[in-house]
């Protein structure tokens, strides 16, 4: 009963409604028989006579191919007596089968359980030892492999039909003889619909519809069981069945150990699963099937392929003339960088520094670095950039490559230091050996020559001592010179700082005095005796300049005295250089002071002019007017012409010049700033005066306001102004 329940679970059948739709010729009695057979029971009440002698078939609509029918025996094949209860083996019948007349072997009540066990053992562990093992042929290109680039299609299932019916023995024999010629084919699963596997690779699925390329029934055993006589002894049957069970178990173990071993070779699979001739979908010849059989898995796709088949990602078949030897094409793998290579790369880059030169030279340097490392330029540059981006900010104690670099540097320093020490020691040893050899030579010589030789040796020693003393003296002299140079530079810096501070103080005092004078002059009203005041101010400025010059001369004399005292302690060459530098620096500073004083004087004079021009006098002060190269608005000629060309000297504007001007003078300056319409650029002279320019004409040569005449007058005025200030 347990076995039949397992049969029920493995062969799930549908309701009687589906059975009535597929088989219109069945009666209610047949439907009852079907239900009883599904449950695995055969009661006497269900074993009634049926008017029709047909078999009851049940469809499996969920099968992956054409409809498979599981056939059960009819009423005629069942014996009512409990001692002779028979259960024939179930069989498949295809929908395309036309004849359904066959007979099945009847079993005794004792053999019922044994046949059930044999049936389930055959379903769970089919044998491979059978000669005529049924196979499945699909419409795919290669039956032994699954191609990843091909869309999966449902395979067409071709199953030989076996119908069990309790008719005449002659018909049974004839049908068995006919069906022995056909090749039975069963469903074969592709890798996409694979059974469940354990981590070791062994299959755990016992369903007959999902076991790969395994026959559901051993037809030779079925035929033998059908051909045997019913009156044969039960003992012989049991022995045969036990032997078959042992063989099946052994075959199952060998298949599970070899078929699902993923580390095994494909040759073992081919030996265990022999390939059968395929049916091409278009009905092609056998050569096409051989080419399709030549395909392999995508992992070893091009190992045995020529140029023709490698394009289509296929293996060369045995009939291919350009078949290659079974040598795998080597895959180009990247060579990893070791720590030593990285250190060497960084050292070479730091030494050659290819990034600090032009592009061509840097390319050559990168190429030389790459050639020494045995790599390409791009790989070396990429690795260098990665190293610098990753590892430059990390500390030395963390990164191993930085540690290696430090260790290499330390080793190099130790090697260099040890090499130098070894060289010194070797020199000392050589000298000692030389002295010893010379002493031995002198001992063999006569006494007179020995004395002469010793005298020479003593002289050489004295010379060497003198040279060493001279070297020490020279080193001491150099150190003293360096110290003297440092002291002299410090003294120069101090003097320059002092002079600069004094000059700043004097400049500030002069500015304060000027501001005081300006304020006093603004408070006083302008009078007719302005010329006398101008002369007094000029004399005062001259006296101030003379006093400043005297102070500068005194400073120069002091510096010269210091230089003379300093020169006595130094060598002549060094004293000359130092004194020249010092004098040049002092002279440049004095010149700057003179220029500043001159500028101050000129500004004083001009300020006096601006203050004295507050009166509406018509006197043309040629000196100050020529400095701006213009005429006052109150000239006797009445020409308000503004000359565009100023002298090279810039006017010394005081900080608040506009505040010191009278309102009338401000208005005159505003009128003068209104330049004419057609003013030309600064680099070219005007060709006409303002009156002729308004008429768009050139000035005639006798025009008093002609620009050439005005320029000549202005040049003369500028010369007079410069002579006056000098």
UniProtKB/Swiss-Prot annotation:
Database matches in InterPro entries: Homeodomain-like_sf, SANT/Myb
Positions with biased composition (Low complexity): 18-39, 81-108, 165-177, 221-239, 516-651, 709-726
Myb-like domain span: 329-388
Region called Disordered, residue ranges: 15-109, 124-149, 161-239, 272-303, 516-726
TM spans (from-to): none
Biased composition (Polar residues): 45-80, 124-147, 183-209, 661-675
Superkingdom: Eukaryota
Protein name, UniProt field: Myb-like protein Z
Species whose genome carries this gene: Dictyostelium discoideum (Social amoeba)
């Amino acid at each position: 009963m347990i076995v039949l329940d397992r049969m029920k679970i493995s062969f799930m059948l549908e309701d009687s409604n589906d059975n009535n739709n597929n088989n219109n010729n069945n009666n209610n009695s047949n439907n009852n028989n079907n239900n009883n057979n599904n449950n695995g029971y055969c009661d006497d009440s269900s074993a009634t006579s049926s008017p029709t002698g047909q078999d009851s078939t049940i469809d499996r609509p969920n099968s992956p191919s054409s409809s498979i029918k599981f056939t059960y025996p009819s009423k005629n094949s069942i014996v009512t007596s409990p001692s002779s209860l028979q259960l024939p083996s179930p069989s498949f019948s295809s929908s395309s089968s036309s004849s359904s007349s066959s007979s099945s072997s009847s079993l005794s009540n004792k053999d019922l359980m044994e046949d059930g066990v044999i049936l389930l053992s055959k379903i769970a562990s089919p044998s491979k030892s059978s000669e005529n093992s049924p196979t499945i042929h699909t419409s795919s290109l290669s039956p032994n492999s699954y191609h990843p680039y091909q869309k999966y299609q449902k395979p067409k299932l071709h199953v030989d039909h076996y119908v069990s019916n309790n008719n005449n023995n002659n018909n049974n024999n004839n049908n068995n003889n006919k069906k022995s010629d056909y090749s039975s084919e069963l469903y074969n699963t592709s890798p996409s619909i694979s059974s469940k596997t354990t981590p070791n690779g062994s299959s755990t699925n016992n369903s007959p519809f999902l076991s790969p390329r395994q026959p559901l029934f051993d037809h030779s055993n079925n035929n033998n069981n059908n051909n045997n006589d019913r009156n044969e002894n039960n003992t012989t049957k049991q022995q045969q069945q036990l032997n078959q069970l042992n063989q099946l178990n052994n075959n199952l173990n060998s298949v599970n150990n070899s078929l699902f071993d993923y580390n095994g070779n494909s040759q073992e699979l081919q030996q265990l699963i022999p390939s059968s001739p395929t049916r091409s979908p278009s009905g092609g010849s056998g050569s096409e099937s051989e080419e399709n059989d030549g395909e392999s898995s995508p992992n070893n796709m091009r190992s045995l392929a020529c140029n023709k088949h490698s394009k289509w990602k296929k293996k060369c078949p045995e009939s291919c003339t350009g078949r290659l030897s079974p040598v795998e094409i080597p895959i180009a793998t990247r060579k990893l960088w070791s720590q030593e290579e990285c250190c060497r790369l960084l050292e070479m880059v730091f030494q050659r520094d290819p990034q600090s030169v032009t592009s061509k030279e840097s390319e050559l340097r990168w190429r030389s670095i790459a050639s020494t490392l045995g790599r390409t330029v791009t790989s070396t540059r990429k690795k260098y950039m990665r190293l610098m981006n990753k590892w430059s900010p990390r500390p030395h104690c963390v990164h191993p490559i930085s540690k290696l670099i430090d260790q290499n540097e330390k080793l190099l320093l130790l090697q260099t230091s040890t090499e130098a020490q070894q060289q010194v020691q070797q020199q000392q040893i050589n000298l000692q050996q030389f002295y010893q050899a010379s002493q031995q030579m002198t001992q063999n010589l006569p006494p007179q020559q020995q004395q002469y030789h010793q005298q020479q040796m003593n002289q050489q020693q004295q010379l060497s001592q003198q040279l060493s003393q001279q070297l020490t003296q020279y080193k001491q002299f150099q150190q003293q010179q360096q110290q003297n140079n440092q002291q002299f530079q410090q003294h120069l810096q101090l003097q320059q700082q002092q002079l600069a501070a004094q000059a700043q103080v004097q400049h500030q005092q002069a500015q304060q005095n000027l501001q005081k004078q300006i304020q006093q002059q603004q408070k006083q009203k302008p009078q007719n005796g302005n010329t006398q005041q101008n002369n007094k101010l000029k004399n005062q400025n001259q006296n101030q300049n003379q006093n400043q010059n005297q102070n500068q001369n005194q400073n120069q004399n002091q510096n010269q005295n210091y230089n003379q005292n300093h020169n006595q302690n130094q060598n002549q060459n060094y004293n000359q250089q130092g004194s020249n530098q010092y004098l040049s620096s002092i002279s440049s500073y004095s010149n700057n002071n003179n220029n500043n004083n001159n500028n101050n004087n000129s500004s004083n004079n001009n300020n006096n002019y601006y203050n004295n021009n507050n009166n509406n006098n018509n006197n043309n002060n040629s000196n100050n007017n020529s400095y701006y190269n213009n005429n006052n608005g109150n000239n006797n000629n009445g020409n308000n012409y503004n000359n565009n060309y100023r002298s090279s000297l810039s006017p010394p504007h005081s900080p608040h010049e506009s505040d010191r001007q009278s309102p009338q003078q401000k208005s005159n300056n505003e009128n003068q700033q209104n330049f004419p319409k057609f003013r030309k650029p600064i680099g070219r002279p005007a060709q006409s005066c303002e009156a002729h320019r308004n008429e768009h004409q050139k000035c005639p040569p006798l025009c008093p306001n002609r620009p050439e005449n005005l320029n000549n007058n202005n040049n003369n005025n500028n010369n007079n102004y410069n002579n006056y200030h000098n």
